[in-house]
Amino acid sequence: MGIDDYLSKIRALTLNHKRVSTITLSETYFNRDEVYGKLMNYYDEVFLLQTCNRVEVYVYGDDDSVAEDMYKVKGTINHVDKLVGMNAVRHIFRVAAGLESAAVGESEILGQVEDAFNDARKRGALGGLLGFTIERAIRTGKEIRSRFPEISIGLASIGSLVAEYVHRVRGLNSRIAVIGAGSIGSDIVRRLAEKGFRNVIIVNRTLDKAKAAALRYGFNYAPIDSLRSVIRDSDVVIFATSATNPLLRRRDAEELSGKPIIIDVGVPRNVDPEIPGVVSIDELKNIENEIREGKRKALDEASRLIELRLIEYRRLFARRVIEGMIGELTKWGLSIGESEVKRAVKAGLIKNEEDGAALAVKSTVKKIMLPLLTYLKELAEEDKFDEALIIISGIKAKLNGDGKQS
């Protein structure tokens, strides 16, 4: 039995956004208690991951037929992808990294995998080789987030593009005025806060809306009739209202002497088109293209890193398997020592099993076995799993055959 035989016991059944609608996914959601209650009777380990984009069951066992039955009951088995061994492992690594999400690179999935992992452990459903696999997937997901933060940058939000533009041209310490607290204005305010801007004032015709948005992020707010003074005191002014008439006319802009940067993303335009130098959505599209290209490169690099971590995982997985077998050998060695101690006690050679000589026997057994156990671990790490397995199998054969201790 080689390493691939142990890996083949890792099985995944995944129903996700690539195959079905979110409505079908929601109709397939399982009761967690029922899933674990049933599957833990058939498999060594079980892991259930359910989000708005996926319903996935992972098991460690010889087949996945019992898990399949749960999807059959829901009527979605024909849309389920079945993954075995390293294909299943690769999938959960990519899921945890956000590379299999509907919005590729989104950050919520990593926390969802971690929550599901903790839930499964509390239930006693993880703790062996599958648990080790999920744990490594989470670790890799965190590494991907840390090394490639750009994969989480959104592309479609006007607010994110505005925040990125302002950050590039004026920096985080600039004084910013956001004119409008509707859907676009609110998105801009949120993105500015997420980016780290702190000196922001929100101006809106309905003061209560400006106040609510400002209080949410610790910003300032002002009524629309103070617009001109707010503009004069700002480094960047962002117009994002649905006003039908321009809020800033050319004669007003002439008084500003070009001091603030004017950004107009209002629909229709909030700024007189005759005012030169106004930044519009067209200029912001250039940033969007840059972000998209940067994100594509980051995703490619993240995928390559995952493949490297999978190579490392396979080596560590082999070591885990060997360590489990080593545990059995250790118990065998200690049992021999304990048997000899009991014989010595019975013969009156030592007082009891806690006698100094008895403890010395146990310590000696551990020391004698240590070089062998260390060697076996090293073989597993050096991708010589089969060689380590032959040695262990040979020892077991001797124990169960002519070399068995009496």
Swiss-Prot record:
Name of a matching Pfam family: GlutR_N
Main function: Catalyzes the NADPH-dependent reduction of glutamyl-tRNA(Glu) to glutamate 1-semialdehyde (GSA).
Record-given protein name: Glutamyl-tRNA reductase
Residues under site feature: Important for activity: 91
General remark: During catalysis, the active site Cys acts as a nucleophile attacking the alpha-carbonyl group of tRNA-bound glutamate with the formation of a thioester intermediate between enzyme and glutamate, and the concomitant release of tRNA(Glu). The thioester intermediate is finally reduced by direct hydride transfer from NADPH, to form the product GSA.
Record remark: domains: Possesses an unusual extended V-shaped dimeric structure with each monomer consisting of three distinct domains arranged along a curved 'spinal' alpha-helix. The N-terminal catalytic domain specifically recognizes the glutamate moiety of the substrate. The second domain is the NADPH-binding domain, and the third C-terminal domain is responsible for dimerization.
UniProt keyword Zinc present: no
Oligomeric form and interacting partners: Homodimer.
Binding site for substrate: 51-54, 101, 106-108, 112
Annotated metabolic or biological route of this protein: Porphyrin-containing compound metabolism; protoporphyrin-IX biosynthesis; 5-aminolevulinate from L-glutamyl-tRNA(Glu): step 1/2
Alphabetically ordered keywords of this record: NADP, Oxidoreductase, Porphyrin biosynthesis
Family recorded in the similarity comment: Belongs to the glutamyl-tRNA reductase family.
Residues at the active site: 52
Enzyme class: oxidoreductase
Top-level division of the source organism's lineage: Archaea
UniProt binding sites for NADP(+): 180-185
GO biological process, alphabetically ordered: protoporphyrinogen IX biosynthetic process from glutamate
Organism: Caldivirga maquilingensis (strain ATCC 700844 / DSM 13496 / JCM 10307 / IC-167)
Record carries keyword NADP: yes
EC number(s) recorded for this UniProt protein: 1.2.1.70
Catalytic reactions on record: (S)-4-amino-5-oxopentanoate + tRNA(Glu) + NADP(+) = L-glutamyl-tRNA(Glu) + NADPH + H(+)
MF terms in GO: glutamyl-tRNA reductase activity; NADP binding
